[in-house]
Design a protein with these regions (language model features):
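A short C-terminal boundary segment appended to hydrolase-like catalytic domains
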Residues: 1, 256-274
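His/acidic metal-ligating clusters that form di-metal
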Residues: 1, 50-61, 139-141, 153-236
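N-terminal active-site segment of His-dependent metallophosphoesterases
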Residues: 1-77
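Active-site-proximal beta-strand elements of phosphoester/diester hydrolases
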Residues: 2-15, 32, 137-148, 179-181, ...
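Active-site environment of divalent metal-dependent phosphoester hydrolases
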Residues: 12-16, 70-75, 96-108, 148-152, ...
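Surface-exposed cleft-lining segments at the edges of enzyme active sites
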Residues: 35-37, 68-72, 146-160, 190-194
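Extended active-site neighborhood of metal-dependent phosphoesterases/phosphodiesterases
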Residues: 79-165, 205, 209-211, 232-243, ...
Length: 274
């Protein structure tokens, strides 16, 4: 018995201008998207990735580790849904954990657009967060740690209830490994100001579960360069990297107690960085 899943993250649909963006954090996201990211985050890679997933990879499920958009403007969510529509319509289960850009601001229109996006994206796998998705040989704990923060922070925050959920699932007498699906890495990355700005607050209990092996694998996004800290059985934490920036899909196969990772380009071919 085996389970194969494909992971992608941080597609960052390009920001669009809104007059309301002048009065909240969206203006910073708009500037970043327009002047720093526009030429290097290539949206056509989403189309190529979906073709590869549907035509050749054919996984049992897909994990999207968040950041569909740049400033959470409703038009960005509409564009992202249009690009992702063939994957949604395929019926392949999609597990989605929101990113900080998906919950960028408190504006009502943006929050409502996010909820519509979430409902359509996960139409075949609806769940409340935190939630559990099960296959015959794996358990996937899907969490939501995205919150609007001030303009200088790109943090997430894990609630005590989410940590309780992970501890309860990890404590179950179940032989199937537990995979945590989130946007923000559980493992801390130093004590610098830059590390804090992108950190996951309140994650110490979850990080301990990962370090103790009670969470077998943490699958996340947020950091745009793909990486992983895995042991000989493929257990640990995998950072997907940005699909549109780095042209990478992560294919993970679980078989005989081992997670095997392949890095692929958006054409489905082996990634030269692997």
């Amino acid at each position: 018995m085996s389970t194969k899943f494909v992971v992608f993250s941080d597609i960052h649909e390009h920001a669009v201008f809104s007059a309301r963006a002048l009065f909240d954090k969206r203006i910073f996201g708009l500037i970043n998207s327009t002047f720093c990211r526009h030429g290097s985050y290539r949206m056509e890679r989403i189309d190529a990735a979906i073709r590869a997933i549907l035509d050749s990879l054919r996984p049992d499920l897909v994990i999207f580790a968040g950041d569909a958009v740049s400033t959470s403007d409703p038009r960005e969510f509409e564009s992202a849904l249009k690009r992702l529509r063939p994957l949604i319509d395929s019926g392949i289960p999609i597990l989605y954990s929101p990113g900080n850009h998906d919950r960028y601001v408190h504006a009502r229109a943006c929050r409502e657009a996010f909820e519509r996006f979430r409902a359509e994206l996960t139409a075949h796998t609806p769940m409340t967060w935190p939630g559990l998705y099960e296959t015959p040989d794996l358990r996937f704990a899907v969490i939501d740690c995205a919150r609007p923060f001030n303009p200088v922070l790109s943090c997430g925050e894990m609630t005590p209830e989410t940590a309780d959920f992970l501890e309860a699932e990890a404590a179950k007498d179940d032989p199937r490994p537990l995979v945590c699906v989130g946007h923000f890495p559980l493992r801390t990355n130093g004590r610098s100001l830059a590390a804090y700005r992108h950190s996951l607050l309140g994650c110490k209990r979850a990080e301990a579960l990962l370090n103790e092996g009670k969470i077998a694998l943490s699958v996340v996004g947020h950091v745009h360069v793909p990486s992983q800290r895995l042991d000989a059985r493929g257990r640990g934490e995998l950072i997907a990297g940005s699909l549109t920036k780095k042209d990478v899909l992560r294919e993970i196969t679980f078989s005989d107690g081992v997670f095997t990772v392949r890095d692929l380009t958006t054409t489905g071919q082996p990634c030269p960085r692997a």
